[in-house]
Amino acid sequence: MRKISLAFLLFSCLNKLTAQTTSVDALALKIPEASTYATSGLVNYLKQNFYPDSARVRAIYVWIANNIAYDVPRLLAKNANGEFKPQPSEDVLKTRAAVCQGYATLFVDLCTGLGVKAVLISGYGKIANTITPSHAWVGVEMNGNWYLFDPTWGAGYVQNNRFIKSFNNIFFKVPPEQMIKDYMPFDPMYQFVNHI
């Protein structure tokens, strides 16, 4: 009987967590367009409609990954050093397109506007056994722990120089010990892994 009660309790908690995430996702996808053309508008909407900070961060990930397309022309126009022209958040919101630096900058700016500690991380990423020459993702501190997010690869992928929208959760709130398998920050401090 005790095992059945424990199994039921575990199932109930898991079901509630899934329902909460589904609810946050549904609300994030319905953010009014008028609130999405400036970081201040998005921050205000998120403050008023999502709580706690974990729900706000989830809403940021879901909204960005579903509303910002990968900017393939910008990818192809990078300079000789493989660098992109900086892309401020307001430009990303205006064009609804970005490369990884723009996705990450917008994510960090929204978190910062909400009082959530976040950092933009640059380094190498590996996807489909191919190492990217340069990539950007986000570190967010939640409840005293650091988690990593990649809204770029959470939005979809590029195939034959075309962006294919394909939202996924693989790159949402990834523990550092897992992220290090496919991501290497230029600054080792942003591994957030204790090697001692």
Where does each model-flagged region fall?
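Hydrophobic/aromatic-rich core segments of domains that either
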Residues: 102-178
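Bacterial Sec-dependent N-terminal signal peptides
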Residues: 1-22
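Short capping loops/turns at secondary-structure boundaries
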Residues: 12, 93, 97-100, 129-131
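Secondary-structure boundary elements
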Residues: 21-99, 105-108
